Amino acid sequence: LDQRNPEKPFKLSISFKAPHGPFDGFAREFAQRFEEALIPLGATANPKEAARQPEFLRNSLEGPRGWEMAHDHGMQSKTQKLLRDYHRLVEGLDKGIGEILAELDRRGLGGNTVVIFTSDNGHLHGEHGFFGKWLLYEESIRVPLLIADPRLPAKDRGRSSDALVLNIDLAPTMLALGGVPVPAAMQGLSLTPLLSNPSLALRSSFFCEHLYEHDVNSPVLHIVPSEGLRTKNWKYIRYIKNPGPEGEQLFDLAADPQETKNLLTDPGAAEQLDILRKEYERLRTELGPHQSWSLKPAR
């Protein structure tokens, strides 16, 4: 900011590592925060939910730590320490963001600067019997997204939207907010219409994937690659290297937002399964060959 031309607009991108491992990497000023707190896990962090997962997932990199957390209901001291440390990292992040906003105000820029806050992934803390960010469950794929535009009229501020939006929408949104034309080649959509009309539906579905496998030679260090299709009310997941019934999942998110009942073989969901499979296959073909990769390729 000291070096910017005050006569021109600026775009500043700030990336925080937190909250990310090592989870005890928080600033020492937060070391006593949450010390007496008992932090609960999500509703699906329980033995029953963990046990229903297919073996290839339970034995993968996400499984053992999440299994342990789910089976002790998060009450073990080391689980509570991890959760407290995670919250300490988030508090440090919150403080850092506050300092940035205060600095913008100090420079007289706060009233003319759009601030966008988001994250690159969610995180499972024992939910469904997993720990990490590698699977397509809601806890893993959903992230916060806040857009604060001081130019908006008061009636359009502080509103929320349940529209399906993606990280690829951020670049078109920033261009549009800055009055720059959005190139037709960009796959994302500008989110600016949502700022005045949060109920607007920008898309009806999206394709999602996680193809990084880490170490394909080790079951306990292997991340199971997956792809899926998410609509407003349904989610279809396919574990692309695990064919057969256990390699697919179908969830009715309207009736089962916690994703506890796989409807893959439910006759009542057969029509919806067929629709989602066909749309998945269409997008899969459009994307071309899989690009899965690993730090340690198969021997």
Predicted regions: what they are:
Residues 276-280:
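Short amphipathic alpha-helical coiled-coil/interface segments
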